[in-house]
A protein has these predicted regions:
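Conserved GNAT acetyl-CoA-binding A-motif
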Residues: 126, 133-144
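Active-site acidic-Proline motif in GNAT/NAT acetyltransferases
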Residues: 113-115, 119, 147-148
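Conserved acetyl-CoA pyrophosphate-binding loop and the N-cap/start of the following alpha-helix
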Residues: 116, 120-128
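Short hydrophobic/aromatic beta-strand element in the GNAT-like acyltransferase core
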Residues: 62-66, 77, 109, 142, ...
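C-terminal "cap" of GNAT-fold acetyltransferases
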Residues: 139-142, 146-153, 157-187
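A short beta-loop-alpha structural element at the N-terminal edge
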Residues: 1-14, 23-27
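Active-site rim helix/loop that mediates acceptor-substrate recognition in acyltransferases
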Residues: 20-64, 69-70, 74
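Conserved acyl-donor/pantetheine-binding loop and adjacent beta-alpha core of acyl/acetyltransferases
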Residues: 71-73, 79-109, 171-173
Length: 187
């Protein structure tokens, strides 16, 4: 487990695209003629966003953590960042005994190479993210996950995260019939 370097952002984006891109017809519908260009655009957008976020790494407000296999290929990634969002802050007020500040540690974009899932990599990534959050002075980590992403939900629950809120659904969430869940864990 280590900090991802700036020259690896395209490789990180490729891994995240593999983990998060959804074909137009869904995962069971197969690929369509438009999936190639849409996937390429999706990966380009992920890479561009990563490069913007990476500028905050030097400030201790963003950390892309990566895990490699024995040959140096990326097999897992998690992003840790310092965030502030009014909906999350509102939900945090319900946590008994928590002193709410105006920022929180946020875990995001975690993915594991498809052939390596269910092998403990997600747990290692989560723990590394929590360690960075502690170094930054936080005692709570937050994250969002889609309710229908059972593998991720189970991994987060196994690692001590609990559902805190079910935020409002975006128009795209309604179209895709999905619900985001806000989860939290004291660290």
């Amino acid at each position: 487990m280590r900090f991802g370097e700036s020259d690896e952002l395209d490789a990180i984006a490729a891994l995240q695209t593999d983990g998060f891109y959804e074909p137009v017809m869904g995962t069971r519908g197969g690929l369509t003629a438009v999936d190639g260009p849409l996937r390429a655009y999706f990966e380009s957008d992920v890479a561009s966003t990563l490069k913007k976020k990476y500028a905050y790494a030097k400030l201790g407000r963003f950390a892309p953590l990566v895990m490699e296999d024995e040959n140096g290929a990326l097999i897992g990634v998690i992003e840790v960042s310092v965030q502030r969002d009014s909906e999350v802050m509102r939900a945090m007020r319900t946590i008994e005994g928590l002193t709410v500040t105006d920022e929180y540690a946020y875990l995001s974009c975690m993915c594991v190479e498809s052939t390596r899932r269910r092998s403990g990599i997600a747990t290692t990534l989560i723990r590394a993210g929590e360690s960075i959050a502690k170094e930054w002075g936080f005692n709570l980590t937050m994250l969002h996950v889609y309710e229908n992403n059972r593998g991720a939900m189970e991994a987060y629950e196994r690692n001590g995260f609990a559902t805190l809120d079910r935020p409002w659904r975006t128009p795209m969430d309604v179209v895709k019939n999905q619900q985001k869940i806000l989860m939290a864990k004291r660290i």
